[in-house]
């Protein structure tokens, strides 16, 4: 999978094709994070073939649809449980992110894993994504934003305008 652009959350439901022996096969549902519905269906078959004796040729997709965030204007803390294949083996990992949406947090996770661990998107498997209460957060990088009286420094910006005179009679004001 190529994690291009912002990933979207899909709900994919699939099953084995009905047969004489099994006329009503059980349905399997998955939350898949993918750039589009084609990749989402492909990832569903990849994961379901690892878990059950099912494959695309002997099964069907019953439903594949986007899942929308309930409250996309509220900042939330997300805990992501994942496993990834590195050059030395397979590792389990728990990570925390702050974002507005679940898909935004997962996209952030894919970017972070690529930057910190050189893990490609195809080598990462998201197992669970959950909204976490502020008191349950473990990572100090996330906990630092839980202060209600948080203050950010004003930037010391030096404006370099090309069409202004280079030498002038007054000093520039760089504090805003």
Swiss-Prot record:
Q: Which domain of life is it from?
A: Eukaryota
List, in alphabetical order, the GO biological process terms annotated in this UniProt record.
Answer: cytoplasmic translation
Q: Which family does it belong to?
A: Belongs to the eukaryotic ribosomal protein eL20 family.
Subunit record text: Component of the large ribosomal subunit.
Record's function text: Component of the large ribosomal subunit. The ribosome is a large ribonucleoprotein complex responsible for the synthesis of proteins in the cell.
Q: Which organism is it from?
A: Danio rerio
Q: Which UniProt keywords apply?
A: Cytoplasm, Ribonucleoprotein, Ribosomal protein
**Coiled-coil ranges from the UniProt annotation:** none
Q: Name one GO molecular function term.
A: structural constituent of ribosome
Output the Gene Ontology cellular-component terms: cytosolic large ribosomal subunit
What is the annotated localization of this protein?
Answer: Cytoplasm
Among the Pfam families in the record, one is: Ribosomal_L18A
Recorded protein name is Large ribosomal subunit protein eL20
């Amino acid at each position: 999978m190529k994690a291009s652009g912002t990933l979207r959350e899909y709900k994919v439901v699939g099953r084995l094709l009905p047969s004489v022996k099994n006329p009503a096969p059980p349905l399997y549902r998955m939350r898949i994070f993918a750039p589009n519905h084609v990749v989402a269906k492909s990832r569903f078959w990849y994961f379901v073939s690892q878990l059950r004796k099912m494959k695309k040729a002997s099964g069907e997709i019953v439903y594949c649809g986007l899942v929308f965030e309930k409250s996309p204007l509220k900042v939330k803390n997300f805990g992501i449980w994942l496993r990834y294949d590195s050059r030395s083996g397979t590792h389990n990992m728990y990570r925390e992110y702050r974002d507005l949406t679940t898909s935004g947090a997962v996209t952030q996770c894919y970017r972070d894993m690529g930057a910190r661990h050189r893990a490609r998107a195809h080598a990462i498997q998201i197992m669970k994504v959950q909204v976490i209460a502020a008191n349950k957060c473990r990572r100090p990088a996330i906990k630092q934003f839980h202060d209600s009286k948080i203050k950010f420094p004003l930037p010391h910006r030096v404006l370099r305008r090309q069409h202004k005179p280079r030498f002038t009679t007054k000093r520039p004001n760089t504090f805003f």
